[in-house]
Amino acid sequence: LGANKLVDITKNLDPANMQNLGGGKLVDIAKTLPPDAMKDLGGAKLVDMTKTMDPTNIAALGSDKAADIAKNLNDDNFKDLGGNKVATMAKVMGGDTLKEIGSEKAKGMAKAMEKDDIQTLASDQIVGLASGIDSKQITDLGSDKLVTMVDKIDVDDVKSLGTDSLSSMMSGVQGTQIADLKDDKKVSIVDNLGANFFNADKASLD
């Protein structure tokens, strides 16, 4: 049929049509569309498609195709999709892919998720998402989400965040929240924080 024709047809499906088609059929359509055709379809239509899919359908998309969808969504699209579905996409994409989708998209996904949604992610998925967000912007997520992410990351994975991401996340977490973290997590955080976090940079030559 060709990608262009498939885009034309899909653009003319409303949510009720999609519901009638079913998630499995929409997965087949999504898998057939190359990245540029996804872009042509537009974020709002991709949201309608993804909303119609259940977790099994989204898993059937595979990591790369789920990422293709995410790359064509903006903050409003992610919000419209809802935290539960965004978390499902994040799980299918996995940590490595989340890290590569671009800061704006990773941040959009994190903003759309509530704390409960973040808690359903695995440690490596949170590391990928967090380290994929520009370290200067990650504090925009707010202290509650940041501490939820830090809490869910395994002690052994803290190092994988990198000092910039870890420092920025911790600067956005409140002191009272740090107190509630497990002791081994606190030790790992201090162990992996960069010198900048401890203001050692003020003693530098510049």
Task: Pin down the residues of each PLM region.
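General marker for long, soluble alpha-helical cores
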Residues: L1-D206
